[in-house]
Structures are given as structure tokens and as C-alpha cells.
Amino acid sequence: MDREERKTINQGQEDEMEIYGYNLSRWKLAIVSLGVICSGGFLLLLLYWMPEWRVKATCVRAAIKDCEVVLLRTTDEFKMWFCAKIRVLSLETYPVSSPKSMSNKLSNGHAVCLIENPTEENRHRISKYSQTESQQIRYFTHHSVKYFWNDTIHNFDFLKGLDEGVSCTSIYEKHSAGLTKGMHAYRKLLYGVNEIAVKVPSVFKLLIKEVLNPFYIFQLFSVILWSTDEYYYYALAIVVMSIVSIVSSLYSIRKQYVMLHDMVATHSTVRVSVCRVNEEIEEIFSTDLVPGDVMVIPLNGTIMPCDAVLINGTCIVNESMLTGESVPVTKTNLPNPSVDVKGIGDELYNPETHKRHTLFCGTTVIQTRFYTGELVKAIVVRTGFSTSKGQLVRSILYPKPTDFKLYRDAYLFLLCLVAVAGIGFIYTIINSILNEVQVGVIIIESLDIITITVPPALPAAMTAGIVYAQRRLKKIGIFCISPQRINICGQLNLVCFDKTGTLTEDGLDLWGIQRVENARFLSPEENVCNEMLVKSQFVACMATCHSLTKIEGVLSGDPLDLKMFEAIGWILEEATEEETALHNRIMPTVVRPPKQLLPESTPAGNQEMELFELPATYEIGIVRQFPFSSALQRMSVVARVLGDRKMDAYMKGAPEAIAGLCKPETVPVDFQNVLEDFTKQGFRVIALAHRKLESKLTWHKVQNISRDAIENNMDFMGLIIMQNKLKQETPAVLEDLHKANIRTVMVTGDSMLTAVSVARDCGMILPQDKVIIAEALPPKDGKVAKINWHYADSLTQCSHPSAIDPEAIPVKLVHDSLEDLQMTRYHFAMNGKSFSVILEHFQDLVPKLMLHGTVFARMAPDQKTQLIEALQNVDYFVGMCGDGANDCGALKRAHGGISLSELEASVASPFTSKTPSISCVPNLIREGRAALITSFCVFKFMALYSIIQYFSVTLLYSILSNLGDFQFLFIDLAIILVVVFTMSLNPAWKELVAQRPPSGLISGALLFSVLSQIIICIGFQSLGFFWVKQQPWYEVWHPKSDACNTTGSGFWNSSHVDNETELDEHNIQNYENTTVFFISSFQYLIVAIAFSKGKPFRQPCYKNYFFVFSVIFLYIFILFIMLYPVASVDQVLQIVCVPYQWRVTMLIIVLVNAFVSITVEESVDRWGKCCLPWALGCRKKTPKAKYMYLAQELLVDPEWPPKPQTTTEAKALVKENGSCQIITIT
């Protein structure tokens, strides 16, 4: 297509699409209508299945600006097509019609968002999105998102709220007053109703959609064909099967819609209060909210109906619906830069960056804290499907297709079957013409061969193994919302684990503290709860610097904060709503020690105790809280001791981050050594700091001060040492994964040294393995980005505490020769900042680091997702196991994401384990491997079933015969369906093995297995077909034939003394038919046994009792009616009587067939991989997986791994391949 006629929307995002414009063509529409009539409606079906064909067949290309229909194509590997109709939104209905008065309602720039003020510069902006004469805006809707035409960028763009391009200053200055009713009405016209509409389709609509599936259309075609040929019984059986399948599918689909609808309907129609510009409070429905509305958060809490940024007060929020984390989160108001001591006026508001100040849609506000007369307010920033919950629901409603080689190969194999059917189709026509068969019979029989080759039961058979695996997973507490992922889990060869709560216990135990006095560490202390420390600043920090709250009288919050607070034994008291309402200011949360801990003596005259001048009651009020930020790695509070004039600032967080914000002279010289000693033992270390604030800081000023103004120039107070024990099962599970050649990677928000220590303790890194730390620094002061390579085991102290970088890893440079490094295993470790720098500036190093990267510390949620993608880019099948809190994106992105949660199902993860243990990972992989092998077995069996039956019919067509109606029925229902659904019941093998199942159907061993069985079955079937004609008793069968009585005892043939039957119009009853029917019936069972694989991925087939019973029963039944014919059975199956000696001969043919088939299949299993390439003269091929190919390259690369005391610098002008150079430091 012409490049000028193509645009790209959502550029650089996951849902990036190309867009083409079209206008409806009347003459094309007329031609298509004629084609639909001539094709009997088939063309209409084809156009329904193929949206791009439908648009191109009925429309002509047009400029995108003026088009009536848009054709969309995703730019990912799937290249999926969608079409949407252009609609026009008229602005004439808006009460204020002047374009100038509307200039502040629409946005500018490359993202369609709200304009902040109606300046002269913005007055023309409405013309970008509307025709100035008619005041109309053109838009289309795709996947619940509206895209509006933007004249500035000459493209469609989606409408945004206040979540992008709006500064924090603007939030307060231009949006905190609320909207007028006119502005509200106008924005509602653009944004529409604030709802996440998951409409449950009617049963009729779902039925039509399901019935129009290509598979069911093919079945309908088959049924009509069979009915025409008077194969009524088999046609009826297929109809019954189809009805059962459709009803089951409809029930399942509708149930999922209802569940999703119920999940999102909780906030759909709640009443909310909003503030208008004249300070009027108006009560409206939540569906009427628009970005810019100022919403009042009720005192008793609510379920948030939108995304909103908090500008007044504090909220306690449960975000478990979005994150899976049940611990309540404290949300504080967004800092107001205009009143900050140290402003951040240039900072743009972002819901992710400022998530501690953002209330997300669907989350539950449990409690609020407020000023009297100053309600708890939040400004609506996103509504409907643009909210965080809306985006989550969209990802469920419109999932990305699963890219798995098995499914691609399955479609390819179906095409092969269609090609085989085409050959049979042509052969049947030619053969029938040569034998002067009637035209009607030729058409029916030639079409019939197609329905035989492509079996109608194939889709149901393929899903059987997955359904059984899902049931087995549910029994062991693993719930699945994406069954197709089970097969993919069978291919996992790398698993990422979160640390806290996943590899280690959720709870932390306080091991002890190590205080600092006069810039020196004191000896570690285990008992914090004693009289000597009760009024120290250290304990005051532990008592106040947390986000704990009481919910229904129970102390709740982060487990680390709970352990820390419980260790000192203090009491936390929160003001009630009534108490707060009696004061002119917010009532703070108060903490105080129990009476028995307070010293009875009067305060000493030392500097420490002069702060406490009211010995009667010693209480500390928490005035302001700056919540913990994973990006900043710290939290802080402003507190005041009762009776003291000055306030105190307390801070806690990652030791490196805290030390970097403290006065250098207060940080001990041996800080790094002490920190290293603890972290290398796997302790979680938290640093504390304190600062006395100026007396001029009033209560109200503190409420609006920025955290940067507080968190600086602190006094370092010491360390809290928490013990985070490994879960009991962790080492054993990781050892099982390593034995199975499955790589394990740690992705954590904890510190580097702690993560490396835990990795060694749990066996992820073996004692003899090297750990190379990649410390990447971004470009700075004209210098290019660089990576410093260090070794984790050679840490030393930093001689200049003042130069401590919060993210720097102090490492002693190693001068030793490391020539033996290639002979030892090595692992890369890095933190989140280094990972981001490497992704941006060292793209060619990313695959190499992914090959041996084992520890990724201080990783933010989005960085975890980027890591999963980087691993997938080198062809790893990646699993992710986490607690669901910060891992939602990574869990969804991984091939197999499993969340450890008490909930039965989490929308954030394909799999959810009710048992909070990583033992679910090997269980999931085992079941995935079993399901994958089952899929292979079933597919191979169904392929052989098609070819065997296809060849049987082709042989019989050569003599103008066919299989009978009940013969088809017996084979397809009694044999095939029973075998398929029972052979899928094999449970998973009891342990993981190093061998992995193949990922696709197109592999040498698998193809050889199928082709060899096809040849064997065709050979023995042909042998029986042609050999029977050579028998001395053979003749063209007719009702008076008496071959049964020519030889053998009358006992065997007594049931066939009377062969008088009605005329056989279809020539079903003959010796060739009987021979082919018996031999082929046994062949289905033979290949079922041959293909029913057991160890090492499934339990042996003899432990599948239903399968064994079914096969034995069918064998006995077929053998019985072959050797001991029953007249009634033979009459129904249209079998003719043959001499007993021929029955024995057929039995011998079947036994030899079974021996050859099973022997060949066992040989392929045992020696196929090693012998087939040699036998075919194939040289060793380059590994298909990128990571395997890369590993071979790195084995002969003398520059890899990087040696210690070296630096990798990015070139000043980075080329497209991200080339870099190695510079050795001397």
C-alpha cells in the first residue's frame, strides 16, 4: 500500500497499529452482493471471518482524514486485522457554542488530553479536532477506546485526561477548584459515561457467533453432505456432539462474561459528591464523572469509581483487587509545589510515579483522615476504560493471542490434511468418471473424502488434555484463568522468582539493632524494649516512621513495619471522626510507650532528655507522612513530641539511600563493612535517620511541604537488622528445577547484597560460582554511559563517606588473573537503575547479560516486566512466580505467571496458587509437560485416524464401494472418541526431568513417527485388500454368496447360513469392505497404544485405567465379532461372511501390524534424536533458540565475560546496534 495513505497509532506502545482509510463503494457492494447470492452465502461467511477482505471487497481507498471506515492492523508478530466505522460527534448541542469559550476543553500536543487554561495560545486548539464550520469531531472506537482525529498531527489519537502532560502545580492551581456545570457537560460529551461496560451478550448473540465459527460451518457442511448420502446415523451423532460442544462452550463463555461483569459492576452506579467552582457540593452518579471533577471521598470509605489524585487529607486503601496485595496502603495528598520550601513545580503528574497519592479505580478506601472544614478531596484524572482497572479489564476482554509453536504447526498440519483431501478429491472424480458413475454420486463421494480427511472431532480432542490438566491443577490448589497457557508451561526453561514472600518467609523477625553514637557503631543489641532506650530518638523513629493504621481495632500495614512496631511494644492510637471534627486541624495519630516502660526518675540534664519537658505523659504525634517509595527506597515522617515546640523528621529505608541523605560526619567510617557483614549473611538491613526541624515550620506548612525539603541533612542513627528466613521448601524446589535444566532468576526490590546472599543460601548460586556485578552509570556531564564490572565477593569499605552514592555498590577491584573463569560458572547481578541504563545504552550487551543474569535487585514493577521481555527476546520460555503485589505486569507478560495468593483466581495472573509456596512451580511445569505430550499424542493419533480412514475409503472407492453408515459410526464414536478422551487421562510424571518435550509438531523424530506409522498402516491395509482377492473362494459378493461354507466348520459359520438381504445400492457389503473394516479397526487401537506415551513426562499408560479398560474392551469386542460372528451385529455393521481361515489370516496380519508399529515407535523414541540426523546425512545444525546460539558464540569469545577492573563504555554516537568498546582501567 502507498506509504502516504498509512498512519500509525499508539506508536511505540504494545497496542501499536497501522491504520488505513476507506470509503464505501456502491459498485463493489453490488458485485459482492451478487457473489453472496451465487455462492449460497459462503462468500458472506468468508468476509465475516476476514475483516480485511470485507473492507477491501466493499470499499475503495481514501484519505484517512475523510474516510468512512478504517482498517487497523497490529504491528506485532500476529498482524491481526480489525475494522471500525468512523462516527461524527456534533458539538452543536453544547450550550456554549463559541469556539473561543471551548478552547480549554480540548488538548494540544501529541496526546489528546485536557487543556489547563484558556490562554490566547490555546484558543485555536479546538480546530485540531473539529471542523470549525460545523463543529464536528470525527472518531472511531476500537477495543473500548475512542480515537479522535487530530488536525495537528494529521492522525487519530485517543483522548486522555489529567494523567499526562499536566504538572503538579497545575493540579492545584488550575484544577482544584472543580468544574462548572457547562464544562462538566462538555467534557462528558467527549469522554462519555464513566463506566467499564462489560455487557453480557445474549444467549442468541453468543449462539450465532459460536455457530458461525469455521469449524461448525464445516461440520454443518459435513452433516448436509452425509444426510444427502443417507448417512443419517453418523450425521445425527455429529449433530448431537456439536450441540453438546456448543452448549458447553456457550455456558463457559457466558459464565466468564458474567464473572467479569460482576467484578467491574461494584462501582458502576454509586452516588458521589463533587465540588463545583462556586464551592457548591453536588451529588451525582459516578457514571457522570469526568476528568477534572473534584470528588469528595466519604468519611466511611468507598469503592473508587475512577482514578483520582488526592489533594486534601489521607486515605487508607485496600488495593488487593488490582495488585493481589492485601496489606492496606496509605495514600497522602499530592505535594503542592507552590507552598513547598523546596518546590517541584516542573514535575509532571504521573499516576505510576505518584501512585502513593493516587486512588485507583476499583480499590476500596477503608478510612480517611481530614481537616475540619477541608474535606478529603481528589481530582478525577481518568475515567472508564482509561483507568487502571479499565486497562486491566481490556486486557482480559481483548487478550493478546498466545504465540506457541504447537498451535502454528497444528494449522500447518491441517493444511497438509486439506492437501491430502484435495488429492483424494481429484482421484475420486477421475475414478468415478472412468467407471461411468452418476454425476450426483460423484459430487457426494468426492466431497465426502474431504470430510473424512479433516476430522470433525479434532478441536475437541486437542482440548481434552488441557481440560484434564486444569482439573488436576485445581485439586492441588492451582487455579487457572487461561487454560491454553498450560501447554506453554510445559516448555518453561527459565523461572523468575520474587524474593520476599516467595523464596523467603513473608514475615520478618527483628534480629537486633546497631545504634550509632558520635559517628561510631555501638555493639549490636537484641532487646529494644528497655527503659534506657524508651525516650531515645532511635526508638522514637521506630515508633513513628511507618504506615500502620488500625482497621476495626486491629493494627494493619506492611509486615516489616508491624514487626518493627511490635518489637518496641508501643501503643498506637488514632483519632476518631468525632475527635477530629472538634478541632480546627487534623488530629494526628499518636504513639506512646506502655506505662511500665517509662522511667520513674525525673529527666536527666543531658542533651537527649531535654526534649521531654512533660514527664507526666510522653506521647509522639505523627503530623505528616511521606509514604515509602520503591523508586526512592525510603519513607519519612514529621512528628512532634507532646509539649515540644519543634518538630522532628524521622526517616528509614535502604542503608545506601539513607546514608546518602545524611551529614557525612554522622555516618561511621566502617558503615560499608558493617553493612556488608549483615547483608552477606542474608539479613534485611534498614537504616534510620533523624533531624530536628526549624521552629518556624508550623503545622499547616508541614502539610504542604515537599519530602525533598525534609529528607536532607539528616543525622545517621543506626541500623535495624531484620531476619528474613528462607521458606523450608525453597532449596529443595530450586534444586529440582536445576536438575531439570531450568534456570532460576531472582527479581527483587531488596538490596543487591541481600539478594546475592539469599541466592547463595537457596542454591540459586552455587558456592564455587562467580558473581559479576554490572554497575551501569548513565551519561553525565558530557561523558558517555559506562558499565563498571566488579566481583561481589570482594567488597570493601568506602574510605570517603561523604561520597556515598545511594545506588553505588562499593567493590574492591580484583587484580587476580581469572583465566579459569571460563571453566567456572558465572552469574551477573545488577540493580534496577543499572538495568535501565543497559537497556537504553548497551542494547547489544542485553542478550549476553540475559544468558547469565541471575540476580536483579532494586527492581521497580515496570523493570520486572522489561526483564521478562528481554529474556523472551532471546527465546527463553519464561515463568514468573511472585506474590502479586509488584509483579502484576511481569506475571501477565511471562509465558507462565503464577501468583501466590489466597484467592482462587486473580485477574492479574494466568495462574494462582492457593498455597503460598514455590512448590507450585514444578507442579505446574510437570502438568504442563503432561498436557503438552498429551496434545502431541492426540494430534498424532487424530492424524493417523484421518489417514487410515481416508485410505480405507480410497481403496473401497476403487471398487465403487465405501464404508457403511454404522461402520463409520462404530469407528468414529465407539473407537475414536472413547480412545481420545481416555488416552488424555494419563497423569503427569512424579518428578521433573532434564529432558524437555518438543515445542512443535514439525520436528524430525515426530514427523518420522507419523510418516512411518502411516506407511505401516497403509501397507498392511493394502496387503489385506489385495490378498483377499487372491483367495480361491473370492468372488464378487452378492446376497447368494456362500464363501463361509466353502471351508471350515459349520459351527463358526452357523450365523450366516442365510445371506438373503435387501439390495445393497451403495455396494457396502463385499469381502474387501469386511477385510478393510476389521484391519483398520484394529489399526486405530494399535496406533493409540503406540502413541500413548508415558515416562518421562506422563505416568505409564497402564496406570491410566480408563484407557486400558477401553482398549481391552474394544479389542475383545472386535476380535469376538471377527472370529465368532453374530448375525445381528454383522447385519447392523453390514459385514459379510468370510471363511474362518481368512479370519485367522486377518488376525495374523493385525498381530504383525501391531508388532511392527509398536517396535518402530519405540525405536523412534529411543534412538530417533541421535540416529535420524545421521541416517539422513544431516550435519549438526545451528541451535534454533537464540540463547543457545549465543552460548556457543560466547564460549569462544576471549573478551567475555568482562574481566574485573574493566569498564565498558558506550560510544558517543551510538549506532543502531548499540556498539560499545571495552576499556581496561590501569
From Swiss-Prot:
Residues 1-28, 50-205, 254-409, 470-940, 984-999, 1095-1105, 1165-1226 are cytoplasmic. PROSITE patterns: ATPASE_E1_E2. It catalyses: putrescine(out) + ATP + H2O = putrescine(in) + ADP + phosphate + H(+). One of its GO terms (cellular component) is early endosome membrane. Its EC number is 7.6.2.16. It is a multi-pass membrane protein. Pfam families: Cation_ATPase, Cation_ATPase_N, E1-E2_ATPase, P5-ATPase. Keywords: ATP-binding, Endosome, Magnesium, Membrane, Metal-binding, Nucleotide-binding, Phosphoprotein, Translocase, Transmembrane, Transmembrane helix. InterPro entries: ATPase_P-typ_cation-transptr_N, ATPase_P-typ_cyto_dom_N, ATPase_P-typ_P_site, ATPase_P-typ_TM_dom_sf, ATPase_P-typ_transduc_dom_A_sf, HAD-like_sf, HAD_sf, P-type_TPase_V. It is an enzyme of class 7 (translocase). GO terms for molecular function: ABC-type putrescine transporter activity; ATP binding; ATP hydrolysis activity; ATPase-coupled monoatomic cation transmembrane transporter activity; metal ion binding; P-type ion transporter activity; P-type transmembrane transporter activity; polyamine transmembrane transporter activity. The active site is at residue 498. ATP binds at residues 498-500, 628, 684, 750, 883-887. Induction: Up-regulated by polyamine biosynthesis inhibitor, difluoromethylornithine (DFMO). The keyword Nucleus does not apply. Mg(2+) binds at residues 498, 500, 883, 887. The keyword Translocase applies. Residues 29-49 dip into the membrane without crossing it. PANTHER family: CATION-TRANSPORTING ATPASE-RELATED (PTHR45630), POLYAMINE-TRANSPORTING ATPASE 13A3 (PTHR45630:SF12). NCBIfam families: ATPase_P-type (TIGR01494), P-ATPase-V (TIGR01657). It is linked to Pulmonary hypertension, primary, 5: A form of primary pulmonary hypertension, a disease defined by plexiform lesions of proliferating endothelial cells in pulmonary arterioles. The lesions lead to elevated pulmonary arterial pression, right ventricular failure, and death. Primary pulmonary hypertension exhibits incomplete penetrance, sex bias and variable age of onset, both within and between families. PPH5 is an autosomal recessive form characterized by the onset in infancy. Death in early childhood is common. This is Polyamine-transporting ATPase 13A3.
